[in-house]
Amino acid sequence: MTTIFERIIEGAVECDKVFEDENFIVIKDKFPQAPVHLLIIPKKHIEKLQDIQGDDFLLLAEAGKIIQLMARNFGIENGYRVVVNNGLEGGQSVFHLHIHLLGGGLLGSIA
C-alpha cells in the first residue's frame, strides 16, 4: 500500500520541503504541534521502527545528523523533542517510518 509519504517522496503530492538528500526528505508537518514541527522521512519504505534490520540501522545515524542540522537551521538547537510513534498502539498514523522534530517554544513534559 502506498502511503502519503511515498507519494510526497515521488513528487506526486505537494509539501513544504525544507531538506532533501539521497536517503531522506524533511518536510514541515501539515498539522504542527509546536512552532517548529518537522518530519524526517527516509526515502526507503520501512513501515515502523521495530522493522529496521541490518544496514538500515545506519539510517538512524544519518537521521541524527539531519536532526542536528535542522535544529541549527531552525534556531532550536538549545531545546527540542524527537519523537517516533511506533505501531498503532504507539500512535503511528502513517505506516512509513518518520521522525518528528518539535521545538521553538517551551514544550510541556510528556513523561
Swiss-Prot record:
According to the UniProt entry, its GO molecular function terms are:
hydrolase activity
Output the SUPFAM superfamilies linked to this UniProt entry: HIT-like (SSF54197)
Q: Name one Pfam family in it.
A: DcpS_C
HIT domain: from which residue to which, for each copy?
Answer: 4-111
Q: Domain of life, per the record? A: Bacteria
Question: Looking at the UniProt record for this protein, which Gene Ontology cellular component terms does it annotate, in alphabetical order?
Answer: cytoplasm
Which InterPro entries did the record assign? Histidine_triad_CS, Histidine_triad_HIT, HIT-like, HIT-like_sf
| Sequence motif Histidine triad motif, location on chain | 96-100
PANTHER family in the cross-refs: HISTIDINE TRIAD HIT PROTEIN (PTHR23089)
According to UniProt, the name of this protein is Uncharacterized HIT-like protein CT_385
Source organism phylogeny: Bacteria, Pseudomonadati, Chlamydiota, Chlamydiia, Chlamydiales
